[in-house]
């Protein structure tokens, strides 16, 4: 699969069932408000679990559980720093995916569209 939007490195072929399942798992991870809040906070930079929990107003154990799910899906990484684990987004693709989801939601809310003129 490729990377990008609007003609920039689009996938060269339709998704097969395995790739479709992987994409669905990623999108399911984004379908949980608490995970979106975590990813949005990490969009601003790496944080240890304690700071992340405080920033989004969740219990540390709940944040740790959600981070484990996000890590297993390849959306975040954790690096040990002394006795803490500092989490960050896996890469810029995760930030772009998050940005596009937020952008799309805002456009729907405002009744806007970025449809190409030939899209009818």
From Swiss-Prot:
Gene Ontology molecular function: DNA binding; DNA-binding transcription factor activity; metal ion binding
Activity regulation, per record: Binding to DNA is inhibited by nickel and, to some extent, cobalt ions.
Keyword Repressor: yes
Effect after changing residue 116 to R: No change in activity. Lack of regulation by metal ions
Effect of residue 109 to R: No change in activity. Lack of regulation by metal ions
Subunit structure and binding partners: Homodimer.
Protein's name in the database: HTH-type transcriptional regulator NmtR
Gene symbol of the encoding locus: nmtR
């Amino acid at each position: 699969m490729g990377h990008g939007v609007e003609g920039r490195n689009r996938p060269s072929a339709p998704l097969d069932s395995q790739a479709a399942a992987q994409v669905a798992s990623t999108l399911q991870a984004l379908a949980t408000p608490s995970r979106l809040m975590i990813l949005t906070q990490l969009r601003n930079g790496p944080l240890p679990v304690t700071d992340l929990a405080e920033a989004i107003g969740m219990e540390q154990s709940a944040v740790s559980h959600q981070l484990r799910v996000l890590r297993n899906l390849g959306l975040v990484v954790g690096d040990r720093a002394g006795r803490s684990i500092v989490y960050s987004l896996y890469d810029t693709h995760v930030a772009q995916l998050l940005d596009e989801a937020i952008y799309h939601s805002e456009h729907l809310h405002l009744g806007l569209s970025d449809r190409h003129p030939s899209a009818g």
